[in-house]
Amino acid sequence: MQKVFFIISLLVGATITSAQDIQYKIVYDLSSSDTAVQATVLRQFNNVLKATPDAQLEVVCHGQAIYMLVKNKIYFEEKMNELKIRGNVSFKVCANSMKRNNVDKSELISLA
């Protein structure tokens, strides 16, 4: 998973240097409940926003990753709020994963 993020970062970095006027829209597909992987995604978002402050970023959480956005189970709410304030960052949750994991919409943090 980290290799994928590294490759995406390289591609974004290479593209940034060649075309500064492009509007970037990046969607991360996150399915891991591993907090190290989740922290990597948030770091990558931070890096992208440093390089291209106008980029539109979105994390789509499904599978066990939905717990990244569940109240009382979240590790990174402060970092996620900071990202949301800095740029066009959104966090989405797969409805099928919520149903499968018996998570109600009311259990999600306000960012989701």
Give a label for each model feature:
Residues Q20-A112:
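Secreted/extracellular ectodomain signature
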Residues M1-D21:
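Bacterial Sec-dependent N-terminal signal peptides
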